[in-house]
Amino acid sequence: MAARPARHVLALPECGAPGDGGANARALVLDTNIVLDLLVFADAAMAPVRTLLDAQRLCWVATPPMRDELARVLAYPQIVPRLAFYGLTAGELLESYEAQVRWVDVAPRISAVCKDADDQHFIDLAVAHRAILLSKDKAVLCMQKRLLVLGAQAATAIVFEASGWTGISHRGPVATTSDMQAA
């Protein structure tokens, strides 16, 4: 019996196509902890994000206040030794960040308010750009339905297989394309 598709995976057919030079790339907003997973810790769960960014199927959008928040986090006493362990400096990491993002204006505040005020600017930007917002923050993830109505999606990870992008994962195990076809 084939596995049923996980309810937490959403198909995203509107994603940019390979080889279109990023012209139709889907906007992506990363909260600060996800940025650390991508740029510092090389978290395996971030491999699909890296692949899709490199292929210009996603366009990482950010604002100067998001960069400032990252700079502040990189100075935290618990982060500094981790940077050193990976042979990185805060300056190098910020340069890498700046080279990879598309700078945009701070988005206007939306009607959906996050319980964690520190995360509101990520939500506002995701809605303004009809973006995927990757976050592990429960205050953000509990807003999934409200964000969908506003044209944005919140998730913890992007799912990618050899056959292509299957969707985004909100939590838990991930359904694959073959699981979805068998259901």
Model regions and ranges:
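Short, well-structured N-terminal submotif of metal-dependent ribonuclease cores
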Residues: 1-62
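Divalent-cation
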Residues: 2, 98, 118, 157
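Acidic, PIN/NYN-like endoribonuclease modules and their adjacent C-terminal/linker elements
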Residues: 11, 16, 113, 120-123, ...
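Alpha-helix capping/helix-boundary segments
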Residues: 34-35, 66, 139-140
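Short, flexible loop segments at the rims of nucleotide/cofactor-binding pockets, characterized by
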Residues: 37-39, 83, 108-115
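Residues that scaffold the ATP/ADP-binding catalytic core of kinase and kinase-like folds
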Residues: 37-39, 73, 82, 143-144, ...
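Residues at secondary-structure transition points
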Residues: 44, 61, 88, 113, ...
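PIN-domain endoribonuclease scaffold, especially VapC-family toxins
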Residues: 52-109
